[in-house]
Design a protein with these regions (language model features):
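Short, Lys/Arg-enriched N-terminal segments with co-localized hydrophobic residues
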Residues: 21-31
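Ser/Thr/Pro/Gly-rich low-complexity, intrinsically disordered segments
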Residues: 17-19
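Extended, intrinsically disordered, low-complexity segments
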Residues: 33-38, 44, 269-310
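Active-site loops and adjacent core secondary-structure elements that bind or stabilize anionic groups
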Residues: 265
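Polybasic, low-complexity intrinsically disordered segments
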Residues: 1-7
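Alpha/beta enzyme core
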Residues: 35-45, 54-56, 60-113, 123-240, ...
């Protein structure tokens, strides 16, 4: 018979939960869960120490998460756009918080490495709303989250800096109460949304990210930047680990590491690449009646099932 000692921490917790029914047993389970999540959070935070650029793949379901884990990545992020699209929503907080975090929870429960959640602008205009989102992210077993400074679903308007700092502080306080060294990745969309005159964007981005760092954010995210000169200026100007979004034209990881970038994420790129492949398969199947795009390089049926039977 398999014993709890032979299982991974999360599995062990589930097994124990079926055997311990006393109040004391419940407290033991909760303590173990908190310790395990805190350990994963510490592992994830340590990956931002700047000694090596953290390459963070972004999953949209359990299958993609398990593939990234099997590939040897030390941590996984989720992609809000990927999860939303997979469930039939456009990106931009059109999917509900509960639906988003249900997927995050399934991903976190399926892998043995840290998971950080993309929860867009935090699902609320007030700090207390964002604090509740952070509590639910923690309940979903994630150890970090992205927080954008956009307003509602508008891409042309950013939140007031002082209000965004209050939201960040609310997340930091929430994670401290939970006893988890949560990694908050504070994002500004100045470059991504082309906010303001082009010549002002660098200074505005640095101002915002440093304000977010002062409020307690552990990592600082500036999507929409891809030229090496601007990246180098951001690394020099911000007072914390910098996260860059990999898109077409982004320098390779080796160059980003030389520039001092702490973290590179890929967002919805892999999910959209998968959709592109499905589109090509569909076109070949309909127009040619052939199957090579589907069969060449495909994961075997056995390997696909093996992802979920460890």
């Amino acid at each position: 018979m398999t014993t709890p000692d032979a299982l991974e921490p999360r599995t062990c917790i589930r097994v124990l939960s079926t055997r311990l029914h006393s109040r004391r047993g419940l407290y033991l389970i909760l303590a173990m869960a908190r310790t395990t999540q805190a350990d994963l959070a510490r592992q994830f935070l340590a990956l931002h120490d700047g000694r090596k650029t953290l390459v963070l793949p972004n999953a949209w379901d359990v299958a993609s998460a398990r593939i990234f884990e099997e590939a040897g990545f030390p941590a996984i992020g989720t992609t809000s756009a990927g999860i939303a699209n997979a469930l039939g929503y456009p990106d931009g907080q059109k999917i509900s918080r509960s639906e988003m975090l249900a997927v995050v929870h399934r991903i976190a429960a399926a892998v043995a490495i840290p998971v950080t959640a993309d929860v867009e602008a935090g699902y609320g205009a007030k700090p207390e709303d964002v604090a509740e989102t952070a509590r639910e992210v923690l309940a979903a077993e994630a150890v970090g989250m992205n927080l954008e400074d956009t307003v509602d679903d508008r891409t042309d308007l950013l939140a007031d800096i002082s209000l965004q700092k209050e939201k960040i502080r609310a997340v930091v306080e929430t994670s401290a109460l939970a006893g988890v060294p949560f990694v908050l990745n504070a994002r500004t969309d100045v470059f991504l949304a082309s906010i303001g005159a082009a010549e002002t964007r660098l200074a505005r981005t640095i101002e915002r990210l440093n304000a977010y760092r002062d409020a307690g954010a552990q990592c600082l995210f500036a999507p929409g930047v891809k030229d090496k000169e601007t990246i180098a200026q951001l690394v020099s100007g911000v007072h914390g680990p910098l996260n860059i979004l990999a898109t077409a034209g982004t320098p390779p990881v080796a160059e980003l590491e030389k520039l001092g970038v702490a973290r590179v994420s890929v967002g919805s790129g892999p999910m959209r690449a998968t959709l592109g492949l499905i589109g090509r398969i569909a076109l070949q199947l309909r127009e040619e009646g052939s199957f090579s795009l589907m069969t060449d390089g495909a994961m075997t049926y056995a390997d696909a099932n093996r992802l979920f039977t460890r």
